[in-house]
């Protein structure tokens, strides 16, 4: 079973498979149209086979983008058929999205990882933690801090600190353990952002993906937009855009990041009631001035 980063990728892949199967079947009658011509052997499939994809589902795709995101699998044809399959991102089929860097920056990894960090010259690691439902979660990661440098992010769950299980700890106890820890080596076991998920969308010809937000929270979804097709929900807060943290930024700044993004936009969202609980008692000015808003490297 194939997985896709967006509904647009799924739909376009189905069109590709149907066209390829039709063209490769010698039993099909010949139709004098460019769209159903035999598959060329030079790998240049899309300008002739799929001209309709350029405006499919409201997408704005040019031939170069389509060709760049499609890989023709080499090797002997099976039963006389040529095999044409889109490129994959993390085992996902993505004929429209392609190898988009925003998806890789925003990826929420399943499983648990271990990070090792040290305190800075002021004896700090640039991290604030919050206790939620007997678990400890990252509330704030400061820019250019040790916590930022090892890749910790807002919403990460801290399972262990220096081998001690954090389950049942209060926020104060977690901060106390970090404060008392030896400064040259602190080992933390992390579960990657369990309350968050990513949604990949595609801009239409006007440069929009189709949602409205206020104070960083999604309030409306535009009918028949990419946001609607891909299941974006209201009452969710935007945590990241293409992997870049936007928590604490003004709506105008978030809008600028969206508008300057490419045609593929991946946002990371969290249910509003959980988001509000995590940031509770943290001043907006702190989130704006201290939160790490840099673009992560991949």
UniProtKB/Swiss-Prot annotation:
GO biological process: actin cytoskeleton organization; chemical synaptic transmission; intracellular signal transduction; negative regulation of receptor internalization; negative regulation of transcription by RNA polymerase II; positive regulation of cell growth; positive regulation of cell migration; positive regulation of cell population proliferation
Stretches the record annotates as Interaction with PDCD6IP: 2-60
Compartments reported by the entry: Cell junction, Focal adhesion; Cell junction, Adherens junction; Cell membrane; Endoplasmic reticulum membrane
Induction: By IFNG/IFN-gamma in melanoma cells.
Example GO molecular function: frizzled binding
Residues given in the record as a 1,2-diacyl-sn-glycero-3-phospho-(1D-myo-inositol-4,5-bisphosphate) binding sites: 215, 250-251
Source taxon at top rank: Eukaryota
UniProt xrefs under InterPro entries: APP-Binding, PDZ, PDZ_sf
Residue interval(s) of motif LYPX(n)L motif 1: 3-7
UniProt motif (LYPX(n)L motif 3) ranges: 49-53
Entry-linked PANTHER family: SYNTENIN RELATED (PTHR12345), SYNTENIN-1 (PTHR12345:SF10)
Role summary: Multifunctional adapter protein involved in diverse array of functions including trafficking of transmembrane proteins, neuro and immunomodulation, exosome biogenesis, and tumorigenesis. Positively regulates TGFB1-mediated SMAD2/3 activation and TGFB1-induced epithelial-to-mesenchymal transition (EMT) and cell migration in various cell types. May increase TGFB1 signaling by enhancing cell-surface expression of TGFR1 by preventing the interaction between TGFR1 and CAV1 and subsequent CAV1-dependent internalization and degradation of TGFR1.
Protein name: Syntenin-1
Organism: Homo sapiens
Gene assigned in the entry: SDCBP
